[in-house]
């Protein structure tokens, strides 16, 4: 029986989840909800179903896999990853997974706050000033490893890819000083399942955010 992934018809928080579902060759279908245009940004497609799905904390994205009904994007990633042993094996690897899972979410949220803010034009230059340091931390954490945790890919590589790619779209030159991050992105995009997905009609690279956002809403 196929899993169902529910989310807005955007990239957003579902990008890493979709990539992981494809990489693991999981059987799934998507339930995509459309938000209305300004000024109302009608969300009735989702709100009409929100409390009817049996979710403990009704929100998007959600994943329904038989009796398992999961919200929170990282919880969904962890659930899929545990099925395929993509959570790290040693204690050291699991520590690195935990650190990067939270760091990637922090940085992703920081960018989203800027992109959704009415003060976007004021906040963007300030964010760009901090960007090299953010990327340097990712670069140092990766080091000479092929994947962020070590020799084997884990689910946090999908989060890291998402956040690095988002920033590459936001500021195309932001990775130029960090060849190991550029190599990581190429390595990730070169994975057979990922490459095939990115060439398919299912792939949804944009819009990055919902229509409420000031930047990345198209």
From Swiss-Prot:
Residues 2-88 form the GST N-terminal domain. GO terms for molecular function: enzyme binding; glutathione binding; glutathione transferase activity; leukotriene-C4 synthase activity; protein homodimerization activity. Substrate binds at residue 116. Signal peptide: none annotated. It catalyses: RX + glutathione = an S-substituted glutathione + a halide anion + H(+); 1-chloro-2,4-dinitrobenzene + glutathione = 2,4-dinitrophenyl-S-glutathione + chloride + H(+); (13S,14S)-epoxy-(4Z,7Z,9E,11E,16Z,19Z)-docosahexaenoate + glutathione = (13R)-S-glutathionyl-(14S)-hydroxy-(4Z,7Z,9E,11E,16Z,19Z)-docosahexaenoate; leukotriene C4 = leukotriene A4 + glutathione. It comes from the Eukaryota. Conjugation of reduced glutathione to a wide number of exogenous and endogenous hydrophobic electrophiles. Catalyzes the conjugation of leukotriene A4 with reduced glutathione (GSH) to form leukotriene C4. Can also catalyze the transfer of a glutathionyl group from glutathione (GSH) to 13(S),14(S)-epoxy-docosahexaenoic acid to form maresin conjugate in tissue regeneration 1 (MCTR1), a bioactive lipid mediator that possess potent anti-inflammatory and proresolving actions. PANTHER family: GLUTATHIONE S-TRANSFERASE, GLUTATHIONE S-TRANSFERASE MU 4. Residues 90-208 form the GST C-terminal domain. Its EC number is 2.5.1.18, 4.4.1.20. One of its GO terms (cellular component) is intercellular bridge. This is Glutathione S-transferase Mu 4. Belongs to the GST superfamily. Mu family. It is found in: Cytoplasm. Keywords: Cytoplasm, Lipid metabolism, Lyase, Transferase. Glutathione binds at residues 7-8, 46-50, 59-60, 72-73. Its main location: cytoplasm. It holds the Pfam family GST_C. InterPro entries: Glutathione-S-Trfase_C-like, Glutathione-S-Trfase_C_sf, Glutathione_S-Trfase, Glutathione_S-Trfase_N, GST_C, GST_mu, GST_superfamily, Thioredoxin-like_sf. Expressed in a wide variety of tissues. One of its GO terms (biological process) is xenobiotic catabolic process. It comes from Homo sapiens (Human). Homodimer.
């Amino acid at each position: 029986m196929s899993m169902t992934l529910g989310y807005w018809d955007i990239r957003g928080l579902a990008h890493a989840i979709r990539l992981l579902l494809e990489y693991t060759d999981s059987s799934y279908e998507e339930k995509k909800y459309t938000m209305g245009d300004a000024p109302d940004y009608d969300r009735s497609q989702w709100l009409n179903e929100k409390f009817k799905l049996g979710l403990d904390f009704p929100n998007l994205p959600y994943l329904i896999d038989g009796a398992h009904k999961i919200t929170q994007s990282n919880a969904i990633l962890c659930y899929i990853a545990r099925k395929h042993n993509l959570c790290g094996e040693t204690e050291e690897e699991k520590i690195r997974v935990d650190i990067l899972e939270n760091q990637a979410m922090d940085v992703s949220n920081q960018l989203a706050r800027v992109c959704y803010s009415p003060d976007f034009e004021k906040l963007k230059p300030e964010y760009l000033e901090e960007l090299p340091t953010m990327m340097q931390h990712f670069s140092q954490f990766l080091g000479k490893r092929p994947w962020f945790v070590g020799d084997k890919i884990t689910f946090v590589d999908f989060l890291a890819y998402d956040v690095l790619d988002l920033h590459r779209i936001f500021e195309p030159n932001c990775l130029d000083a960090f060849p190991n991050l550029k190599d990581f992105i190429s390595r990730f995009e070169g994975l057979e399942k990922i490459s095939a997905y990115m060439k398919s009609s299912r792939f949804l690279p944009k819009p990055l955010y919902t229509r409420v956002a000031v930047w990345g809403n198209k």
